[in-house]
Amino acid sequence: MIALIKRNLKIYFANKIGVLMSCLGALISFFIYIGFLQQNLISSWQSLPHTKEILDLWMISGIVAIAGITTSFQALGQLVKDRESRTWDDLSLTDLTPFQINCSYLTATIFISTLMQIITFFIMAVYFILVDSITIPTTALLPGLFFIVLGAIGASAVNLIIVSRAVLNYHFIAV
């Protein structure tokens, strides 16, 4: 099972363009916020104290969540490719049960999603610290990491259900 997890991680990170594309949803949201929405929202929420800091932290949390969803979905593309190319059938001939095979895809996806969310958080945090001079308390980093991992688990599990159902439905239609 560990070998299959390593395989899935190697395949995912070998495709540099695919890695970049999996973060594209989050990056597009980030650039839209910076370019178009930030000043509009700040002027609309003027009555609140520390408006810019509240909005920036809110955007960080929302966009990091988007990164978790999109990267986990992209990472599960390997499951679809393996089913399509019948690699899944070869894997089922090993001593791994279908549950263990699915768990290996899920574990690799959770790792990928967590890592990409951390990278997204880091990029956004550095930008907002440098440009908007916000402060992120160090006491918030550990709970934030917990929620990133929790979000990665949730997004990966939901996306695995969606992808598995779609693959099974396609398999029955194609046969």
Residue ranges and their predicted role:
Residues Q39-E53, I129-T139:
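Short helix-coil transition/hinge motifs at the ends and kinks of transmembrane helices
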Residues I28, L55-F128:
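Hydrophobic alpha-helical transmembrane segments of multi-pass membrane transport proteins
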Residues L41-I42, Q78-S85, D132, S164, ...:
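Perimembrane helix-loop junctions in membrane proteins
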Residues I11-I42, L55-S72, S113-Q117, A174-V175:
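Hydrophobic alpha-helical transmembrane segments of multi-pass membrane transport/permease proteins
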Residues G18-V19, Q78, I101, H171-I173:
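Alpha-helical transmembrane segments and their helix-entry boundary regions
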Residues I11, L91-L93, V163-V167:
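Helix-capping/transition residues at the boundaries of transmembrane alpha-helices
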Residues P98, S104-V175:
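Alpha-helical transmembrane segments and their short interhelical loops
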Residues M1-F13:
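A short amphipathic helical element positioned immediately N-terminal to and/or at the very start
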